[in-house]
């Protein structure tokens, strides 16, 4: 295996568990290094296993509106420069951006140095969303940049079979790979003994949706199916937990 740098550009929403689960499959003996973009909650610092910390570089920047705007319009040059510096210091031969394909400008510099650049594609199409106008504008600009980077990327990986087929039809001349989605159910979750106060004394099992609450995820269909299926609602509770707004009427009983 060629010496590899895995780059995670965000721990936002589901990306935090996704990245940490992948990183934690490695051991210190593997010839792999990690550059992880953290926020105020120090998600990666907390969730990456200690024996890998010597292989990790944690990049931290406040998740402020100003930093978001600056990064959206100008890119994060400091972060890109850190990628290049780590490649030089560690003699990296492969860089894998696992949250999105690499920015075109960074990918070109790396390729000119003989470094293979791999990008994971998560969303070929932008998610449906209903947000404030300024957030919709930001999402549109981000999507435009993401599409540009995907179009440029020479080696792409995806965790979705349908998306892999679509990539094959869109980019017949690219190097494309499918890899099954890593489980986000960690050992800590499986063996956990702590309960939120709201769930500690329930009198029957529950079906849990946990994650950011957004319209495109079809939570309204999940709720409708649950309330209209006696086999479910008589023997289970439905628990919807996460940040966001539930955009449909519901029976709060």
What are these regions (language model features)?
Residues 8-13, 25-74, 163-168, 178, ...:
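N-terminal strand-loop element at the rim of the active site
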Residues 198-217, 223-226, 238:
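Conserved donor-binding/catalytic core segment of Leloir-type glycosyltransferases
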Residues 84-86, 105, 112, 136-156:
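Membrane-proximal helix-turn-helix segments that form the acceptor-binding/catalytic region
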Residues 76-81, 94-121, 125-126:
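An aromatic- and histidine-rich active-site surface loop
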């Amino acid at each position: 295996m060629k010496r590899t740098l895995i780059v995670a550009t965000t721990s936002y929403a589901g990306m935090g568990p996704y990245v940490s689960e992948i990183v934690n499959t490695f051991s210190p003996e593997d010839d792999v290094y990690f550059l992880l973009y953290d926020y105020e909650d120090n998600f990666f610092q907390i969730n990456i296993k200690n024996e890998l910390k010597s292989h990790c570089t944690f990049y931290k920047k406040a998740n402020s509106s100003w930093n978001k705007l600056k990064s959206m319009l100008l890119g994060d040059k400091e972060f890109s420069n850190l990628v290049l510096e780590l490649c030089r210091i560690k003699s990296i031969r492969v860089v894998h951006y696992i949250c999105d394909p690499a920015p075109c400008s960074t990918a070109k510099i790396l390729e000119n140095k003989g470094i293979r650049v791999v990008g994971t594609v998560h969303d070929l199409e932008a998610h449906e969303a209903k947000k404030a106008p300024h957030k919709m504008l930001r999402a549109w600009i981000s999507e435009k940049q993401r599409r540009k980077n995907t179009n440029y990327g020479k080696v792409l990986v995806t965790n979705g079979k349908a998306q892999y087929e679509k990539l094959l039809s869109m980019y017949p001349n690219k190097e494309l790979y499918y890899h099954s989605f890593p489980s986000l159910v960690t050992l800590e979750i499986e063996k956990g003994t702590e309960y939120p106060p709201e769930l500690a004394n329930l009198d029957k099992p529950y079906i849990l949706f946990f994650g950011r609450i957004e319209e495109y995820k079809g939570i309204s269909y999940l709720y409708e199916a649950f309330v209209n299926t006696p086999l479910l609602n008589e023997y289970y509770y439905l628990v919807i937990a996460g940040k966001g707004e539930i955009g449909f009427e519901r029976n709060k009983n």
